[in-house]
Curated annotation (Swiss-Prot):
Subunit structure, as described in the record: Homodimer.
GO MF terms, alphabetically ordered: NADP binding; shikimate 3-dehydrogenase (NADP+) activity
GO (cellular component) term, any one: cytosol
Entry protein name: Shikimate dehydrogenase (NADP(+))
SUPFAM superfamilies from the UniProt entry: Aminoacid dehydrogenase-like, N-terminal domain (SSF53223), NAD(P)-binding Rossmann-fold domains (SSF51735)
EC number from the UniProt entry: 1.1.1.25
Gene encoding the protein: aroE
Binding, NADP(+): G127, S128, G129, G130, A131, N151, R152, T153, V154, D155, K156, I219, G242
Family the UniProt entry places it in: Belongs to the shikimate dehydrogenase family.
Amino acid sequence: MKQLYGVIGNPIGHSLSPVMHNDAFEHLNMDAHYHAFLVEEELLGEAVRGLKALGISGFNVTTPHKVAIMEYLDEIDPLARKIGAVNTVVHKDGRLIGYNTDGIGFVRALQSISNEPLQGKRILLLGSGGASRAIYFSLADVGVKEIDVANRTVDKAKELIAARTADVNSVALSLEKATEEQGNYDIIIQTTTIGMHPHVEHTPLQICSLKKGTIVSDIIYNPFETKILCEAKEQGAIIQNGIDMFVYQGALAFEMWTGRTPNIERMKQLVIEKLGG
C-alpha cells in the first residue's frame, strides 16, 4: 500500500516540501506520496487525529503550528522539548512522536561547508526567535562551547541563553555591540527575517571587519544573497544561504520516516530550480 506523508501549515501553497520529497520517493523507487495540507489553527487537534486515523506514516509541521502541535502528540523528543517546537512527526506503532530537525538540519548544513569541526569555533547568533533557539540548542547538543547571541532586545537574548542546559559559554549582546565585536567570531549565523524579500535593503548587522575565513550563514533563501551575505562576500567570507538548511532538515525528516538517505545534492538543485535560480 502506498505510504502517505505530508506537511501541515497555513499558508501552505508556497511549500517546496512536496516537490522535494516526492522527487526523492520517485528517485528511490518508493511507493509513497507527500501532500501539503492546509490546516487552520482552530482545527489543528482534529487534523492531527484525522491524520493519525488515516495511518499517515509521518508529516512535517510548519507555521503556525510548530508549538501548538506539541499537546496533540504522544511523545516528544528531548531536543524538540528543549527547543519548544516540533517540525517533524513520525507515526510509529500507533504513536505520534515529535522531533525538531530545523536545528540539526542547520548544523549538518553548516558542517557541509566548514573545513574544520564546529566544536572549537566561536559562534555569533543574530536573533533569538524560534529558529535561533533551534540552532542554539542543536549547536550545544553537538558540543559547541562558545555561542553568543545578539538581538535588538538584549533581554530576549538573555532569556534564550538562560534556558541552556549544556555547558556553553554565552554572552547576550546588542546588535551595536555585535557589530563592534564581529571580528572575534569564526561563524556568524543570521536567524531573523531581516533582509527577506521584499525588504532586501535591510540587514541586522553591517559587515565591516571580519577575520579571514569567517563563515557567514543566513537562514533566508529569498533572495539567494541577502544584504548581509553580499557584504560578507565582499569581505572574503565563506557564505551560505538558507537553502542548505531547508534541504538538510527535510532530508533528516525523510531519513527518520523511511530509514533511507535521499540524494542531498539532487534535493538542493531541485529547490534552487523551483525558486528560479
